């Protein structure tokens, strides 16, 4: 992994390198984790930085992994809320229990977005996922790309997060070690 990171930087030193989506970091410019937690309080606790405590990790017990070094911190997989047709539930899955009421889906999604908005060190999130795939039914859209939900309502929930950072950290002297 170190060699691939170094080669990528040699080819294009301006390009940030994410060595492993969802943690497992060896050498990285972007600290990315996955968190499908649904509860606001747990998400805030997971992603609020505490002095002297390493940030949330998906793989905390692997001593060979890199330590957090001030990289931009992203949750590059969140959401994962399964909305599965009853006829497909035996052959499909999502992250966590299926959501039976559409209004519950919106409430959970909004709580997740509110939680990440409250976490000042989280500089980016990515909802998993845009569309259903063969066996994974976490999409905002069905496999055939038709919407499962009120897309305008989904958009309004995501628009609670600003599209820019009001007080960005000065990362001009930051480098991965």
How should these model regions be labeled?
Residues 1-145, 153-157, 167-174:
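Substrate-binding/catalytic cleft of secreted carbohydrate-active enzymes
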């Amino acid at each position: 992994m170190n060699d691939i990171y170094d080669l990528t930087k040699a080819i294009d030193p301006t390009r940030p390198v994410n060595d492993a989506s969802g943690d497992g970091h060896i050498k990285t410019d972007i600290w990315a984790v996955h968190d499908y937690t649904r509860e606001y309080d747990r998400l805030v606790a997971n992603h609020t930085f505490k002095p002297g405590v390493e940030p949330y990790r998906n793989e905390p017990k692997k001593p060979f992994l890199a330590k957090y070094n001030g990289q931009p911190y992203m949750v590059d997989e969140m959401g994962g809320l399964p909305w599965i047709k009853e006829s497909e539930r035996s052959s499909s899955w999502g992250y966590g229990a299926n959501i039976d009421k559409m209004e519950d889906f919106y409430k959970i999604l909004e709580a997740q977005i509110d939680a990440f908005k409250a976490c000042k060190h989280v500089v980016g999130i990515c909802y998993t996922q845009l569309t259903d795939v063969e066996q994974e039914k976490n999409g905002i859209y069905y496999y055939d790309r038709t919407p499962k939900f009120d897309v305008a309502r989904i958009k309004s929930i995501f628009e609670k997060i600003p599209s820019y950072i009001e007080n960005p950290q000065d990362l001009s002297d930051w480098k991965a070690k």
